[in-house]
């Protein structure tokens, strides 16, 4: 190969190859994603609409299920995003699959980037489609089941930050809060991408377990040190306490994005190292 790092034509052929080989597995995962979200949204909608048939809900302008749908979206995003990331290097589980990957005429970066693209960018696109389809399924089912409830509508994703609309349920009052949550999602997702490179087998469980233990020890140590060395009779002002909420959110958002970039880059070098070891 003349270009030993990245070639667009070669990368396109690699993506096409991966898409042809993995389309059945990806389609099955998309159907599972849609099915799980549909079952949960329809189940909660039944609980609300079936037990709440008063005059107020029949003529209200806000769907009473929207608050749950908004929160469920975040849980789905983090949960399924982590699960998708844990499948990034699933083709490296067995010795035969690793040897097959080595035989592909592409650089380590192209192989890693093609897998990262599917588990990160393509997943977000398909997740939004599956979520909207699941929500529209809920709306169709209950508009026929409860025709008197005029407020049954699909949840508008812009309702999180649009403070001018009285019809929307507010999860975040400010845009900077939503940006921070998305940055946090990228960081969490990057941990599972890194875990997939380190542990191709049972990646999700191993990454979740190790991450939980590290987080518990880290925050436990911080709390213990603060409790040991702080004087409860005194009040301490930190530099962050003088910042506005928007400034603090911006800082933590930048740190989360930098952490995600670090994990993605570290995952690439770990993947490249594993390929070198396999060739030896």
Task: Describe each model-derived feature in a short phrase.
Residues 1-99, 108-280:
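Hydrophobic alpha-helical transmembrane segments of membrane proteins
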